């Protein structure tokens, strides 16, 4: 699992709207921000986004 620490790979802005910039990981744990492609619905807190697409298989 790629922890995708945005502080190392890009910039992470947390708040009402979470955004990751320059994040190139392919699978991300949602600790602060998800790194799924733009347009993806954010997973509930604690969920893990896998791969490059978000759908029903994204959250577990």
Swiss-Prot record:
Residues 1-28 are annotated as: Beta. A divalent metal cation 6 binds at residues 36, 40, 43, 59. A divalent metal cation 3 binds at residues 14, 18, 23, 28. InterPro entries: Metalthion_dom_sf, Metalthion_dom_sf_vert, Metalthion_vert, Metalthion_vert_metal_BS. Class I metallothioneins contain 2 metal-binding domains: four divalent ions are chelated within cluster A of the alpha domain and are coordinated via cysteinyl thiolate bridges to 11 cysteine ligands. Cluster B, the corresponding region within the beta domain, can ligate three divalent ions to 9 cysteines. PANTHER family: METALLOTHIONEIN, METALLOTHIONEIN-1X. This is Metallothionein B. It comes from Notothenia neglecta (Yellowbelly rockcod).
């Amino acid at each position: 699992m790629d922890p995708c620490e945005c502080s190392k790979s890009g910039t992470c802005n947390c708040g009402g709207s979470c955004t990751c910039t320059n994040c190139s990981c392919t699978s991300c744990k949602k600790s602060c921000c998800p790194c799924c492609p733009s347009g993806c619905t954010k997973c509930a807190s604690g969920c893990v986004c896998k791969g490059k697409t978000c759908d029903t298989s994204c959250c577990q």
